[in-house]
Amino acid sequence: MSAVEQHIPNDQFLQKLTAFYRDSKIRGPKSVYVTMKPYDGRTKAMPKGSTFKEGDEISCIFRAKWGSKKIATEVKAKEVNKFHTQYSAIIVAQMVNLEKRKKTDDEKKKTGATKA
């Protein structure tokens, strides 16, 4: 992406996010990073201590990164529920990719002591 971030449509973002998860399972880096922040259309940072005004139309910006590939979309307040439902479905479908974390010896001792 360039210095000014280009936002893609929500449906296209979800399709590319699904492709990121699928590709991360097959090849390349395993981690897909997704962030969500409030967004009011500014391209420059807000001064410290300032907040959104009540009259402002607040939306959310979703960003995803997999390896060197980055995508972003702006979700308007009216579309949040629809987007969140679709996003949740993608996350649930991709949970099969999660790997169980291996416990260290210290963690095994702690859990064994609490069970007794």
Curated annotation (Swiss-Prot):
GO terms for biological process: protein targeting to ER; SRP-dependent cotranslational protein targeting to membrane. It is found in: Cytoplasm. SUPFAM superfamilies: Signal recognition particle alu RNA binding heterodimer, SRP9/14. GO terms for molecular function: 7S RNA binding; endoplasmic reticulum signal peptide binding. The keyword Zinc-finger does not apply. GO terms for cellular component: signal recognition particle, endoplasmic reticulum targeting. It holds the Pfam family SRP14. It comes from the Eukaryota. InterPro entries: Signal_recog_particle_SRP14 (IPR003210), Signal_recog_particle_SRP9/14 (IPR009018). Its main location: cytoplasm. Keywords: Cytoplasm, Ribonucleoprotein, RNA-binding, Signal recognition particle. Disulfide bonds: none annotated. Belongs to the SRP14 family. Heterodimer with ZK512.4/SRP9; binds RNA as heterodimer. Component of a signal recognition particle (SRP) complex that consists of a 7SL RNA molecule of 300 nucleotides and six protein subunits: srpa-72, srpa-68, SRP54, F37F2.2/SRP19, F25G6.8/SRP14 and ZK512.4/SRP9. Component of the signal recognition particle (SRP) complex, a ribonucleoprotein complex that mediates the cotranslational targeting of secretory and membrane proteins to the endoplasmic reticulum (ER). F37F2.2/srpa-19 together with F25G6.8/srpa-14 and the Alu portion of the SRP RNA, constitutes the elongation arrest domain of SRP. The complex of F37F2.2/srpa-19 and F25G6.8/srpa-14 is required for SRP RNA binding. This is Signal recognition particle 14 kDa protein. It comes from Caenorhabditis elegans. The lineage of its organism: Eukaryota, Metazoa, Ecdysozoa, Nematoda, Chromadorea.
